[in-house]
């Protein structure tokens, strides 16, 4: 059986559970190494209690981040978000799901206007 590599990790401790987000946020994963809503939901709701969410992510798919945001907002326990490196782009959406949001003095939260990319020829 193949081990799935994830950019998050749950740690259960006396205060509740701690979740580490470290990597790109994606709707689906081709290589099982992205933060995806489906897998995250399974792990979030397999236990209860308060949750601490550590974020260090450059962002990714805003729709996947929106799903994770909604899951954290619906979660019954207290959600504390801690940004210890970078919470950029779509990761900033997840950061806003916390009942409390804390940042290291050397961390960065980057929120930007929506952007898109298109390509093709003039006649397309």
Which sequence ranges carry the predicted segments?
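Terminal-region recognition feature
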Residues: 1-124
């Amino acid at each position: 059986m193949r081990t799935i590599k994830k950019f998050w990790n749950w740690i259960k401790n006396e205060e509740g559970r701690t979740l580490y987000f470290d990597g790109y946020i994606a709707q689906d994963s081709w290589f099982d190494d992205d933060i995806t809503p489906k897998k995250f939901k399974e792990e979030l709701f397999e236990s209860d209690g308060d949750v601490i969410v550590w974020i260090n992510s450059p962002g990714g798919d805003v729709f996947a981040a929106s799903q994770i945001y909604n899951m954290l907002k619906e979660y019954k326990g207290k959600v504390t978000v801690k940004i210890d490196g970078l919470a950029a782009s779509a990761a900033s959406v997840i950061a806003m799901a916390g009942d409390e949001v804390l940042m290291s003095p050397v961390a960065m939260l980057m929120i930007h206007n929506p952007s898109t990319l298109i390509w093709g020829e003039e006649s397309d």
